[in-house]
Amino acid sequence: MMNVATIGSGVIVDRMIEAMRLDGRYNLYCVYSRTQERAKEFADKHGIQKYYTDMEEMLNDENVDIVYVASPNSLHYKQSKMALEHKKYVINEKPFTPTLKECNELFEIAKKNGVYIFEAITNVHLPNYQIIKENLSNCGDIKMVQCNFSQYSSKYQRYKDHIQTNAFDPNFNGVALMDINVYNLHFVTGLFGKPKDVHYFKNVGYNGIDTSGIIIMEYPDFIATCTGAKDCSSP
């Protein structure tokens, strides 16, 4: 059984802890949060005995095998890099990193230190997705692929009231492309590979972030569109 350290205290971490316990192969060893009050509160909530407020101290704990990174998007690269450099396995929440350069660097660091890093993306691992993949050749001549993941954010009203939250903060990469449309991108590229060209058309909020947008992906014989929104919902 491998010992897991979690970084972050949002709802997604609650769900990951629940999933790991259901799986039975992981021991929830410790949690990390920036403040002692929040770290203790989150640890107590999940019955985890150990908590840290110092990242370096946590990573120096020899009992930690895996680090699950679920902090704001802009921190994924830095925190994953620190964990890999301490020879910890890493499960990094989506979006993996803001840039391809950072992504490739993390893979190189993992390889150098003899550990692995994974992106915690879910949809491409679901049984129904595998069925689609296995039966794609039976679908005939594909000309259009349409994906839509639009979910009105519970924090959008606060954003409209000019109350800043991480979910809509450009400093934390709180944008629709990375938060929502990333699922559509995985869905399409997992089935069809890299497109020959990509265009992104977005609705931009008052602070410069995209609150929704449409990606058009051009393949040799068809077009795929990916719609992702945090400012409205789809059926």
Per-segment meaning from a language model:
Residues 35, 124-125, 148-154, 202-206, ...:
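Glycine-rich beta-alpha junction loops
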Residues 105-122, 141-144:
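Rossmann-fold dehydrogenase core element
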Residues 123-196:
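Predominantly a Rossmann-like dinucleotide-binding segment in NAD(P)-dependent oxidoreductases
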Residues 185-235:
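Contiguous beta-strand/loop segments that form the cofactor/metal-binding neighborhood of enzyme cores
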Residues 26-30, 65-67, 117, 174:
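Short active-site oxyanion
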Residues 6, 16, 46-109:
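Beta-loop-alpha module in the N-terminal Rossmann-like domain of NAD(P)-dependent dehydrogenases
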